[in-house]
Amino acid sequence: KDMRNYIDVMIPRGGKNLVKKVKELCNVPVIGHLEGICHTFIDKKVNAKMARNVVLNAKMRNVSICGATETLLIHKDCPKKEINLILNELKNNNCLIYADKKVRKIFSGNLKKATNKDWSTEYLDSKISVKIVKNVNEAVQHINKFGTMHTDSIITNNPVNANYFIKNVKSSIVMHNTSTQFADGGELGFGGEVGISTNKLPPRGPVGLNQLVSLSLIHISE
């Protein structure tokens, strides 16, 4: 039965299949997200210790939440020693790593071979895909192609690259030197939440240019 006279909006709270089914069948606006394919990009100029700590938290603090990092992107000029330390940190915490060819050549241990499917997989588990990119532009292109506009983070000491990343990724929440798991309402100062929306529409009332502009939440850490 059509319930549009009684229900203004639906906010599904549950697993991926529930949210997908509600979005497919619902005749009223739906607020929410289907998947959280979140990324962390490590630039070539970073605080090495901070990068390791942020990546470990972003992936392993709670692997089953939508804000967990599922893909790690690494600048091609990031020191090989640092890449090995980060990946070893993940492996030592029982994280299964799916890596592209370039990463597998750099890392001294055994890694699983990444496929195209891995770049669009929300693992919700102790698993992560890792890819080498040539610059921040390629990182942004990868995120906008495979991501779900949830939460994505750049780790860098370069303010120009940080600003480019923040302005060009399409995510609802954009991080600089911050774990993607720092994305809930309480942590951002909004109090309790019923979900995280990746929607850009709808506006209400007269629709002009301002009403057609969406926003992103930007979180910057030192």
Where would I find each of the regions flagged by the language model?
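A structured beta-alpha segment of the ubiquitous adenosine-cofactor-binding alpha/beta core
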Residues: K1-I7
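Short, structured coil segments at secondary-structure junctions
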Residues: Y6, C26, N93, V169-K170, ...
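Residue-level signal for inorganic ion chemistry
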Residues: M10, H75, A139, G191
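ALDH superfamily catalytic-core signature
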Residues: V19-D125, H176
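Short, well-ordered beta-strand elements within core beta-sheets of diverse protein domains
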Residues: L72-I74, D125-K134, M149-I154
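A C-terminal functional module that forms or caps the active site or interfaces directly
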Residues: H150, I154, P159-K170, T178-T180
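Internal helix-turn-beta structural module
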Residues: S171-S172, T180-V213
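Conserved small/polar residues in nucleotide/adenosyl-binding loops
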Residues: I218-E222
